[in-house]
Amino acid sequence: QMSFFDHVTVVHGVGVGGGSLVYACTHPTPKDDFFEAASWKHLANWKSELEPHYQTATRMLGAEPNPCDEIGDQIVREIAADLGRADHYEKTRVAIYFGEKGKEGKEVPDPYFDGKGPSRVGCIQCGACMTGCRVGAKNTLDLNYLYLAEGLGCVIRPETEVTAVREREGGGYVVETKCSTADRDHVNFTADNVVFAGGVLGTIPLLLAMKADPLGLPRLSDRLGDFVRTNSESIIGVCAEDDAVDYAKGIAISSIVHTDDHSHFEIVRYGKGSNFFQPYFLPHAPGKSLAGRVAETVRILRRHGGRYRAMKRAKDMASQSTIMLYMRTLEGSLKLR
């Protein structure tokens, strides 16, 4: 699902497994400056508080260094050397089951939880991690946390949206839900405690609505939605002149270069045929209105049309292009209202 705001476009997962269904599998551990950010360092020693949980998540999600080396990784290594940052190039740590070399695509019994988890299939490097792993190599939550929880008796209700959470007289809460795919009867639940874990765009809008509702959760903080952080992504597409090289082979994000203490860029790919994001290769055209941005796009295309010729001719953008994903950890935030 994509949500569009004035300053950012957000891609997020909706389904059993949430964002794990569409994320790029990477599991970096933040650097010290993240834990020492001025906005929250006074609240706790976050590094020591969170370290055990990073370790648990790494184990549960089977995160390991990417063992593959494809053309995109070689290009990133060359860029790192050109920038004088060769020592700051590394393979990503990813939640993917690779299996034994030579047995890619082969199904094996659960390799993670002493046989209590589902069988898995070794990664075939098809590049389709973010559009839904076709083989069962990506360690999405439905293959670990949720799978094991169901085995212990937890009931997972798919196609269900929480519409309200209200305090219950005498203590606890009432959770109101509706089916998200059919006009069925609404179902209410009661609980002593409620954990909100719907991601930013599944949680904050619901809480804002409940704060505004006198019968909801009106005592929530007035600062709700004030400090929403992003990873400050910039997406840069590069298209080859021909289809001599298959840039789609590999995993979604396979290697990374730390350009300085606060920023890095990664090589990103989609699987063959995943061309929905082809418009991202159009020129960046800022403006105060949609009409102004469209006009600026047309102007740039007229002036520099040759640069975009390869994009127009590409039979399959996913296999004929690669994406450079730039991020930074410096503090920056949005307000959601």
Show where each model-derived region lies.
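Flexible loop/turn segments at secondary-structure boundaries
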Residues: 30-31, 97-99, 164-166, 202-204, ...
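Redox-cofactor-proximal catalytic regions of oxidoreductases
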Residues: 1-68
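Glycine-rich loop(s) and the adjacent beta-strand/alpha-helix scaffold that form part
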Residues: 1, 135-138, 143, 151, ...
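Charged, glycine/proline-rich intrinsically disordered loops and linkers
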Residues: 1, 97-122, 283-308
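A short alpha-helix-loop-beta-strand transition element characteristic
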Residues: 2-8, 13, 63-67, 85-97, ...
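Conserved redox-cofactor binding core of oxidoreductases
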Residues: 45-152, 157-159
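Short, solvent-exposed loop/turn and secondary-structure capping segments
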Residues: 25-26, 34-35, 101-102, 205-210
